[in-house]
């Protein structure tokens, strides 16, 4: 289901000068023969970014997942890029979230970085994020203009690919703009904000239970803290209330 989008993502990264980097030992790929599930992951070194990760889970008709997060260099205070695409083939259900994830919720910060995403939401009104914002804390790492898609095969094959391509193009444009001007948030503060993002996300990651069910707790714990959110082990924080996707039933 998501292989064409995965190739589009990787192609766009290569065009921007990206090169693959080493994934921690044992985390590049994991397979569960009994459940016929396979997860593969990539790390990219991209000019202007300190880290760009991509993961693809293929569990046949049961579940398809494409996930990616891009972390800009600390001297660039632009939002992270985050996307989560899930397809439940047996139920013909799609859940997709695409967002520029803000480091802070300051009004001037949002005005400076989110004009492009605002325009995309106007261009794709069927992907308004109003519904999904009930599932997450809007005062943290989600923007008011995230693109949210829930539907069946028609949205998966029509609306999503077009929005996905436009979303990537918009983020690259934002990065090019920010690369030409000084960041307003000091690099040391951006670093702390990105660490806080990893901590926050690791504590609430809705996919951790899913990965555990397919690949076991030991592997999934390593995947969470060594690949998905590696900065989450570098500081302590108080456990928050759990959050989860509103997945199809």
UniProtKB/Swiss-Prot annotation:
Alphabetized UniProt keyword annotations = Oxidoreductase
What InterPro entries does UniProt report for this protein, alphabetically? Answer: DiHydbiliverdin_OxRdtase, Ferredoxin-dep_bilin_Rdtase
**What domain of life is recorded for the organism?**
Bacteria
What HAMAP family has UniProt attached to this entry? Answer: PebA
Q: Main role?
A: Catalyzes the two-electron reduction of biliverdin IX-alpha at the C15 methine bridge.
Identify its protein family: Belongs to the HY2 family.
State if Oxidoreductase is listed as a keyword.
yes
Q: Which GO terms describe its biological process?
A: phytochromobilin biosynthetic process
User: Which E.C. number(s) belong to this protein?
Assistant: 1.3.7.2
In Pfam terms, one family for this protein is Fe_bilin_red
GO terms (molecular function) for this protein are: 15,16-dihydrobiliverdin:ferredoxin oxidoreductase activity; cobalt ion binding
Write down the chemical reaction(s) this protein catalyses.
15,16-dihydrobiliverdin + oxidized 2[4Fe-4S]-[ferredoxin] = biliverdin IXalpha + reduced 2[4Fe-4S]-[ferredoxin] + 2 H(+)
Q: What is this protein called?
A: 15,16-dihydrobiliverdin:ferredoxin oxidoreductase
């Amino acid at each position: 289901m998501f292989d064409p989008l995965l190739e589009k993502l990787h192609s766009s990264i290569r065009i921007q000068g990206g090169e693959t980097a080493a994934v921690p030992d044992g985390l590049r790929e994991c397979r569960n023969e009994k459940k016929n599930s396979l997860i593969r992951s990539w790390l990219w070194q991209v000019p202007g970014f300190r880290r760009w990760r991509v993961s693809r889970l293929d569990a046949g008709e049961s579940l398809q997942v494409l996930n990616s997060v891009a972390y800009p260099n600390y001297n660039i205070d632009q939002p992270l890029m985050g996307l989560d695409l899930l397809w439940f083939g047996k139920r013909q259900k799609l859940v997709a979230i695409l967002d520029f994830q803000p480091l802070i919720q300051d009004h001037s910060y949002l005005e400076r970085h989110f004009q492009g995403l605002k325009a995309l939401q106007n261009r794709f009104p069927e992907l308004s994020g109003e519904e999904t914002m009930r599932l997450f804390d809007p005062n943290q790492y989600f923007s008011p203009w995230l693109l949210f898609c829930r539907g069946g095969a028609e949205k998966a094959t029509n609306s999503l690919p077009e929005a996905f391509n436009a979303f990537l193009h918009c983020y690259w444009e934002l990065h090019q703009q920010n690369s030409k001007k000084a960041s307003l948030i000091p690099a040391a503060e951006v670093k702390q904000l990105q660490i806080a993002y990893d901590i926050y996300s690791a504590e609430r990651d809705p996919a951790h239970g899913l990965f555990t069910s397919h690949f076991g707790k030991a592997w999934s714990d390593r995947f969470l803290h060594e690949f998905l959110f590696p900065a989450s082990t570098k500081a302590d924080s108080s456990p928050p209330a759990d959050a989860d996707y509103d997945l199809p039933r």
